[in-house]
């Protein structure tokens, strides 16, 4: 039978919640993304908590909180310990995203769900892969190959292909078919007939306007506000879609010579741009080629200033400016505070470039019509002074003493246990009873052997050892001296990273610039003070879709082109999910599933695949033809079962010669161009390809329909002339002949 495949949504099904799914392939359990909302509610992770200890591998697709926000918490509290796989940009920018979120939370609350050390620990052993790199899993996952492919949504964004026994499971969420300023379009269209496609219905009900028109509307909206004396706030993510917006602003500001300042404000903004400059090979072809020829880096931003605090903004006062500030949800971070400052002025604009997460302030402001007033909580962290500082220091001193005492007791217990177990073997004063009972040959007045048992010489476990303990380390020696261990001289992976990429170590210090690191490492005793207030929303509010996802029309087209055997729909509103499910169900050859959260569906392939061993003698007589990455050949055989193993038996009789088989998929449009290059006059007429004066090619059969598996025929009509044989020969050259 086919490879066993089960899918269980843990979050992000029939809703727009964070993405987290369990995929089991022949018993090997993948966690597809590990997202969390900016609200950080641990109760949302209950489905994940039930299965976290059983996960064998984690695959991360994008570097934002909706895809990896819960990873540190899951590894610290839920027992998740599986290896994590991601591309280099998702790894690097994912850490910066969580750093930014942690700092934003700590500045307004006593956030303790995870720490900076937890973030570092979660990403410490991430296996980083390149696009299209096949990675073979070991041990329990033997035979499974995973490979990341371009998603087109953000830098390093991934469509995962998981292959077992020739069957592909494709996980493609938040993909974008469009080529953008810094990204290529998704590679999803290159996949053909995967066994299972897991994709999202997020944009199933939405259709985009033309990108050029959208960019122009975006710039016009900004310029209109700036020329009117107002300022613009763009709530953005830390290191994802903000990169595309930065390039749009940089390009238009440079072309129009605009003087209004643009600020990129996050706790890690300078570090983000520095890293992005080194990821040119992950961007689209035009950026890479431009750098090769002119050494001009697209992210050497001249019109955008990166800042990590609000001091620069406060110097400008009410002067017109554009501020890109995290977080996009407006729950915490610089965007929250700047919104409160700007909301009271009608001349200002808050422009959202992505949908707000459910339950957040951003989503509340995006409803139609928007609220006229909102309640917000303003919090800030201030240093402790006076009696509060003294009480804090006394409490810290008490905690230190308790920890020191506890450590001392633990060390004493370990010493006691060690001495107790070795006392009998190492102390010469302890006399073994087995050696104390010796026969006496000298005789005694009783004329017999006397057994003398000496007891009471074992020192108590609490006593001090009579001498310092000494343990001799034994080493192996050969004719040339002491044998060395080559592993002691190997360069560690993180050290290699440091040599290949400046400042690219895995620790916090190497990930951040000096200013950001100072924010994180600030240990000044402080407290958080909060107060609720009502904000009158007088400023303009607008939403423009710069999320970098394919729209509904494109998603349907991509699914039809890929033509999976089974389709699993996740991450979309109930309306969008049902709409896309009904649309795809019209294809009778496609099985469509839309599971609820914690509902397990079996999408095992209906195909019967068996493993057979072919002898060298048989293979030596086989003529193979290369087809893409594989080789194909025709073999006549009888399959029988012996000793519970499938083996290839020799044929009982000489098989009849088989008819020639042409393998391939011909597109008439491509063949038309091919014939034109050969000097033939070709044109389409009535759905057929007219070649010269007399020859016509028609493509007939069920396989002409997208996703169908029926037979396909190409008919050559015309007299047996010189053109006929020439065109037939050229047609044969487009196929593999068996």
Swiss-Prot record:
One of its GO terms (cellular component) is cytoplasm. Its main location: nucleus. Gene3D superfamilies: Ribonuclease Z/Hydroxyacylglutathione hydrolase-like (3.60.15.10). One of its GO terms (molecular function) is RNA binding. It is found in: Nucleus. CDD domains: CPSF2-like_MBL-fold (cd16293). Keywords: mRNA processing, Nucleus, RNA-binding. One of its GO terms (biological process) is mRNA 3'-end processing by stem-loop binding and cleavage. It holds the Pfam family CPSF100_C. The keyword Glycosyltransferase does not apply. CPSF plays a key role in pre-mRNA 3'-end formation, recognizing the AAUAAA signal sequence and interacting with poly(A)polymerase and other factors to bring about cleavage and poly(A) addition. Belongs to the metallo-beta-lactamase superfamily. RNA-metabolizing metallo-beta-lactamase-like family. CPSF2/YSH1 subfamily. CPSF is a heterotetramer composed of four distinct subunits 160, 100, 70 and 30 kDa. PANTHER family: CLEAVAGE AND POLYADENYLATION SPECIFICITY FACTOR SUBUNIT 2. This is Cleavage and polyadenylation specificity factor subunit 2. It comes from Oryza sativa subsp. japonica.
């Amino acid at each position: 039978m086919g490879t066993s495949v089960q899918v269980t949504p843990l979050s992000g099904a029939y809703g727009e919640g964070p993405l987290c799914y369990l995929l089991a392939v022949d018993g090997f359990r993948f966690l597809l993304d590990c997202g969390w909302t900016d609200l950080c509610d641990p109760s949302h992770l209950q489905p994940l908590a039930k299965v976290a200890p059983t996960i064998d591998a984690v695959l991360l697709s994008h570097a934002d909180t909706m895809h990896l926000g819960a990873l540190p918490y899951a590894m610290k509290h839920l027992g998740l310990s599986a290896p994590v796989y991601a591309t280099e940009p998702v790894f690097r920018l994912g850490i910066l995203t969580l750093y930014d979120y942690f700092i934003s939370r700590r500045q307004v609350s006593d956030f303790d769900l995870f720490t900076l050390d937890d973030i570092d620990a979660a990403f410490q052993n991430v296996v980083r892969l390149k696009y299209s790199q096949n990675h073979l899993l070991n041990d329990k996952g033997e035979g499974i190959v995973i490979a990341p492919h371009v998603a087109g949504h953000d830098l390093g964004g991934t469509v995962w292909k998981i292959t077992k026994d020739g069957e592909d499971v494709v996980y493609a969420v938040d993909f974008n078919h469009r080529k953008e300023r810094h990204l290529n379009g998704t590679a999803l269209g290159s996949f053909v007939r995967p066994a299972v496609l897991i994709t999202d219905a997020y944009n199933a009900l939405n259709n985009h306007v033309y990108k050029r028109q959208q960019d122009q509307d975006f710039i016009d909206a900004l310029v209109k506000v700036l020329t009117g004396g107002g300022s613009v706030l763009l709530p953005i993510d830390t290191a994802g879609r903000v990169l595309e917006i930065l390039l749009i602003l940089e390009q238009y500001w440079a072309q129009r010579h605009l003087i209004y300042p643009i600020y990129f404000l996050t706790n890690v903004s300078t570090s983000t741009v520095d890293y992005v400059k080194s990821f040119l090979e992950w961007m689209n072809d035009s950026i890479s080629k431009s750098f090769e020829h002119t050494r001009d880096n697209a992210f050497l931003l001249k019109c955008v200033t990166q800042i990590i605090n609000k001091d620069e903004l406060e110097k400008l006062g009410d002067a017109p400016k554009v501020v890109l500030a995290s977080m996009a949800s407006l729950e915490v971070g610089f965007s929250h505070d700047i919104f409160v400052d700007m909301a009271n002025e009608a001349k200002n604009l808050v422009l959202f470039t992505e949908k707000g997460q459910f339950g957040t302030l951003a989503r509340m402001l995006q409803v139609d019509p928007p609220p006229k007033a909102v309640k917000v909580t303003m919090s800030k962290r201030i240093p402790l002074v006076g009696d509060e500082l003294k009480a804090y220091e006394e409490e810290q001193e008490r905690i230190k003493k308790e920890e020191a005492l506890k450590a001392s007791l633990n060390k004493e217990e370990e010493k006691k246990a060690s001495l107790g177990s070795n006392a009998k073997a190492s102390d010469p004063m302890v006399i073994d009873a087995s050696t104390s009972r010796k026969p006496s040959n000298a005789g005694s007045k009783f004329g017999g052997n006397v057994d003398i048992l000496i007891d009471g010489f074992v020192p108590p476990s609490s006593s001090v050892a009579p001498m310092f303990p000494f343990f001799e380390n034994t080493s192996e020696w050969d004719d040339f001296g002491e044998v060395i261990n080559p592993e002691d001289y190997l360069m560690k992976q993180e050290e290699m990273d440091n040599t290949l990429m400046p400042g690219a170590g895995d620790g916090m210090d190497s990930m951040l610039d000096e200013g950001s690191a100072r924010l994180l490492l600030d240990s000044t005793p402080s407290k958080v003070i909060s107060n609720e207030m009502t904000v009158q929303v007088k400023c303009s509010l607008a939403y423009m879709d710069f999320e970098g996802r394919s729209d509904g029309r494109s998603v349907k087209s991509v699914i039809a082109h890929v033509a999976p055997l089974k389709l699993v729909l996740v991450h979309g509103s109930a309306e969008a999910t049902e709409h896309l499910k009904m649309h795809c169900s019209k294809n009778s050859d496609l099985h469509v599933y839309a599971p609820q959260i914690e509902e397990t569906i079996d999408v095992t392939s209906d195909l019967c695949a068996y493993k057979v061993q072919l002898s060298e003698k048989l293979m030596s007589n086989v003529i193979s033809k290369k087809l893409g990455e594989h080789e194909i050949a025709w073999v006549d055989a009888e399959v029988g079962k012996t000793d519970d193993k499938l083996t290839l038996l020799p044929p009982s009789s000489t098989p009849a010669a088989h008819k020639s088989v042409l393998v391939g998929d011909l597109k008439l449009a491509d063949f038309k161009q091919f014939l034109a290059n050969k000097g033939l006059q070709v044109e389409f007429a009535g759905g057929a390809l007219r070649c010269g004066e007399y020859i016509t090619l028609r493509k007939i059969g069920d396989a002409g329909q997208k996703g169908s598996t029926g037979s396909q025929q190409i008919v050559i009509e015309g007299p047996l002339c010189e053109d006929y044989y020439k065109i037939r020969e050229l047609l044969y050259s487009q196929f593999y002949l068996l």
